[in-house]
Design a protein with these regions (language model features):
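Nucleotide-activated sugar donor-binding and catalytic core shared by glycosyltransferases
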Residues: 1-191
Length: 191
């Protein structure tokens, strides 16, 4: 996955949603895990909505999951804000380019926890546990759970405290540098 970023992220990439967010700090949101359905998802969305209401220089793009419960909850809490765009799911090329242009990422997804640090993006993981503890240990990820107040406080901290933001965005990436396939190819050529 990390190697793929080297081929999918492009300098000349453009998209109408990114054009919309160009005058702001872009926050990418993904949230869909089954264990977060119901109140945990509501807590997550309310914390995000509160931050958007308070901090004028951010915009949120949420490529929404197909689950109808997720869609209903998102539209109810996030759907009527001019600085939040709920869009259809993105293909991998688009998604990687959105991540690359974001300021930070809020997610409950597993794969993004590996991809975003490769792009120097802080990740707030809205789950109680993660299968990627090396990212927590390295400082590229922060596990914030699904408590509304905790998400709000940690999100706001990264938006307002440059040193906290830089500590995460510049942390050593435990998931590789994106050149594993090249190294393997070089070794195989030498055999």
């Amino acid at each position: 996955a990390i190697d793929a970023l080297r081929t999918t992220v492009r300098e000349d990439y453009s998209n109408e949603h990114l054009d919309w967010a160009a005058d702001s700090r872009l926050i990418m949101l993904t949230a869909h895990r089954r264990e977060n359905l119901g109140e945990p998802l509501r807590h997550m969305f309310r914390a995000i909505r509160k931050i958007v209401d308070e901090i004028p220089d951010i915009k949120v793009i949420y490529p929404i999951h197909m689950n109808p419960v997720v869609r209903q909850t998102a539209n109810e809490i996030l759907g009527n804000d001019e600085r939040i765009r709920i869009i259809e799911p993105l293909d991998v090329l688009d998604f990687h380019n959105f991540l690359a242009r974001s300021y930070l990422i809020l997610t409950d997804s597993g794969g993004i926890q590996e991809e975003a640090p490769s792009l120097g993006k802080p990740v707030l993981v809205m789950r109680d546990t993660t299968e990627r503890p090396e990212g927590i240990k390295a400082g590229t990820l922060k596990l914030v759970g699904t408590n509304e107040q905790t998400i709000y406080e940690q999100f706001k901290l990264l938006l307002e405290d440059k040193s906290e933001y830089e500590k995460m965005s510049k942390a050593s990436n435990p998931y590789g540098d994106g050149f594993a396939s090249k190294r393997i190819g070089d070794i195989l050529e030498g055999v």
